[in-house]
Amino acid sequence: MASLRDIRKRIRSVKNTRQITKAMKMVSAAKLRKAQDGILAARPYATMLDQIIADLSARAGDESLSHPLLTARPVKRVELVLLTSDRGLAGGFNSNVIRRANRFLYENTNLESIRLSTVGRKGNDFFRNRGQNIRKDFGGLYQRLNYRAAADVAEELVASYLNGEVDAVHIVYNEFVTAISQTVKVAQLLPLQTLGTPDQASTAGSTSLVDFKYEPDRQSVLDRLVPQAVNIKLYRALLESVASEHGARMSAMENATSNATDMIGNLTLTYNRTRQAVITKELMEIVSGAEALK
């Protein structure tokens, strides 16, 4: 049986751990709110871009509108961009998305090549430790995450696509649903997939369909907007991943705090029982000694 001193040390240790997990939960909750604000701010812009591009494509009429980032070609070489976190203690956040990336690699072994790029230290460490060749690790992106930083990454991926190095670019990430729920998603970044028709784009957004007039011409507008649509799509995926990370960590730390509280209760009960047993034993020894002196 553990001594009272050992049990007290364990209680003190668990209490210290509970303080840490509680603080981490509060920090993650604050960061989650900020990440959610970013998602909400980007959503109307992204939806309107999709609507305009779909409108341009659907209302082209006799015009020959095209853009290389909208044109699909036979897929032989693919780049997979994996979004994980830099830190752990986030439940199944990283393991789920890494498992999905592994499945993507396994399901597409018929391709000529699959290049892997990573955002986040956890995914990079996992695949490097297993001998997987990583084309590029966009390290430190989360520390400076904004639209411009995401656009820099997107422009590098676009250059690879336009140069013919890859025929498609996919991103695998955690899509934010709620603070306690995230969905692993594989999304095609290039060639860009629009919502198809202007009616579909309008239905997906909050704005009603507008018959736009484009100046100076449709092709010029399309050339300007398509790269921006790629940028915002990657930026939204990064924001979704960040929000999912903080939601998963907040949930994990809440569970850890709850478990620590339960453990403290059990240890306190054990401590009291052990203390009672020690006192009872001492009383019995005193009584026995007194009886022996009679």
From Swiss-Prot:
Pfam families: ATP-synt (PF00231). GO terms for cellular component: plasma membrane; proton-transporting ATP synthase complex. GO terms for molecular function: ATP binding; proton-transporting ATP synthase activity, rotational mechanism. SUPFAM superfamilies: ATP synthase (F1-ATPase), gamma subunit. GO terms for biological process: proton motive force-driven plasma membrane ATP synthesis. It is found in: Cell inner membrane. PROSITE patterns: ATPASE_GAMMA. InterPro entries: ATP_synth_F1_ATPase_gsu (IPR035968), ATP_synth_F1_gsu (IPR000131), ATP_synth_F1_gsu_CS (IPR023632). It is a peripheral membrane protein. Its main location: membrane. Keywords: ATP synthesis, Cell inner membrane, Cell membrane, CF(1), Hydrogen ion transport, Ion transport, Membrane, Transport. It comes from the Bacteria. F-type ATPases have 2 components, CF(1) - the catalytic core - and CF(0) - the membrane proton channel. CF(1) has five subunits: alpha(3), beta(3), gamma(1), delta(1), epsilon(1). CF(0) has three main subunits: a, b and c. Produces ATP from ADP in the presence of a proton gradient across the membrane. The gamma chain is believed to be important in regulating ATPase activity and the flow of protons through the CF(0) complex. PANTHER family: ATP SYNTHASE GAMMA CHAIN, ATP SYNTHASE SUBUNIT GAMMA, MITOCHONDRIAL. Belongs to the ATPase gamma chain family. This is ATP synthase gamma chain. The gene is atpG.
